[in-house]
Amino acid sequence: MYEEFYGFSERPFQLTPDPAFYFESVTHKKALSYLGYGLNQGEGFIVITGEVGSGKSTLVAHLKQKLDDERLTVGEVVTSALDGEEMIHVAARSFGLDVTGGDKAADLAAIELFLHEEARNGRRTLLIVDEAQNLSIGALEELRMLSNFQLGSHPLLQTLLLGQPEFKQLLAHSDELEQLRQRVIAAHHLEPMQPGEIEPYVMHRLNHVGWNGNPEIDSGIWVKLHKATGGIPRKINQVMTRLLLLGAVEEQAVLETDMLEAVIEEMSGDAAPVE
């Protein structure tokens, strides 16, 4: 509705990750640098953590656009609570392998054969595991064991782990993950956006959908928006969606700070809080 009222080509603040809307904040720029370094090493584990809605999935979607898919094969896993055997099966399926499950040895053999074939064809292999905080210790250990596969002295698999802050804590302090910890070659925790990044972030997304100055945005909004959302991108998107909707319903050409305050108050008391 509001996108039609304001003449946008699409919704600028949708919650699903879209690399077309990628905004390089200070913390995301650092994360990309660590990812680039880690991928150039071609081995071990890269770990990216951050709060819910901090932009981990959008970062990875942006990264995938930059990867050379003729030289790098990527498998992706979004985890629920997997045990070790399930992790092996899901990893195999992420690479398109025809495995039936229930036979860990067969699944491992299929993965090893696949990795060797990719290497012989001049391709590296990356496994991306999202929501890593849901993995059991056993599943994480199985991922470490997969990193043992080699062709000569060259590792055949590299793994990117994405998780919430509790995964960062688990990895840092669990005695059972000492060996995995030693194989982490790059890590970064996504911080919230800084106050001065809120306006550029919002305008970046608006410009992407053809914003032409309508609606105008009161300059007092940015400080209040940062305070209300803590600089978390998903929270900003939620608030801005509701603010634009209010503006369209009331046929406003200017988004005022009192409108933002009304939206924040409403969201704090309904079933869709800023969280």
Listing of model-derived features with the role each one plays in the protein:
Residues 64-67, 167-183, 192:
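Short regulatory helix/loop adjacent to the ATP-binding pocket of P-loop NTPases
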Residues 1-42, 273-275:
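A short, basic N-terminal segment
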Residues 93-96, 165, 174, 193-212:
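Conserved AAA+ ATPase "sensor/coupling" helix adjacent to the nucleotide-binding pocket
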Residues 83-84, 99-142, 151-157, 193-198, ...:
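Mid-core helix/loop region of P-loop NTP-binding domains shared across ATPases and GTPases
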Residues 11-13, 71-72, 82-101:
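Conserved NTP-binding/hydrolysis module of P-loop NTPases
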Residues 77-81, 171-174, 185-198:
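Conserved AAA+ ATPase "SRH/arginine-finger" region at the nucleotide-binding site
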Residues 179, 208-275:
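C-terminal alpha-helical "lid" subdomain
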Residues 41-63, 80:
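Walker A/P-loop nucleotide-binding motif
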